[in-house]
Amino acid sequence: MIDFEHVTKIYKRSDTPALEDIDFHVDHGEFVFLVGHSGAGKSTLLKLILREELPTEGRVMVDGKDVARLRRCKVPFLRRQMGIIFQDFRLIPTMTVYENVAFAMHVTNIGRKDIKERVNYMLELVHLEDKAKVYPEFLSGGEQQRVAVARALAHSPRLVIADEPTGNIDPEMSLEMMELLERVSEMGITVLVVTHEHELVRRFNRRTITLKQGRIISDVPASFGEEVHV
């Protein structure tokens, strides 16, 4: 699903690589943590996957496509294969929960009836079916994050990227969020969780890639998840 082949990224007006010789593969349906301190290169790696940046050297493949070779008009189609969950939720305050979840599907060719069925299914999945007509300001942080998950999944993505998904919610809600993402992975969807919360990573014992100063310093399989490097 994701392939980085000896990828280096150097930004303009910088002599220091943001990423250097990054090489890894993520299978379809795999659940992977990406960890590292601020400045380790996590954000740059995500930008390469999303094709917001291009590699200086090497190749980035997403779902079999070389992102650097994609024509600009094809980039939106690549991104529609992804569901993004942001730390700050990014819900539209003037839309209800239902409307927020349905929003991304309106730009596709999905019919109104199918959208309704899909949104209702997603809200049941995240246990928010009774909040469909509520506006974001009346939701707790954990509820807003679950709406963000439902929205990310609504258009049936092949890849879900969660960027610090527990950063703005309490520890109990963080555990619920990770359990929800595990259920997403069990649906055959590739899940990449970017986080700096090492205790959470150890608890869920999944494959963990650790970045430090732009390089991968460890890539630990799930069965040995407790050995995460900091």
Report the location of each language-model feature.
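A short, flexible loop at the N-terminus of ABC-type nucleotide-binding domains that lies
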Residues: M1, K9-D21, R71
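Helix-to-loop junction immediately C-terminal to a conserved catalytic motif
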Residues: L50
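Conserved ABC transporter NBD signature motif
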Residues: G58-D66
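Short coil-to-helix segment of the ABC ATPase nucleotide-binding domain corresponding to the Q-loop/switch region
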Residues: M95-F103
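Conserved ABC ATPase signature
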Residues: Y135-L139, E143-Q145
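A short, proline-enriched helix->beta-strand linker immediately N-terminal to the Walker B motif
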Residues: A154-R158
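Catalytic Walker B motif of ABC-type/P-loop ATPase nucleotide-binding domains
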Residues: V160-D163
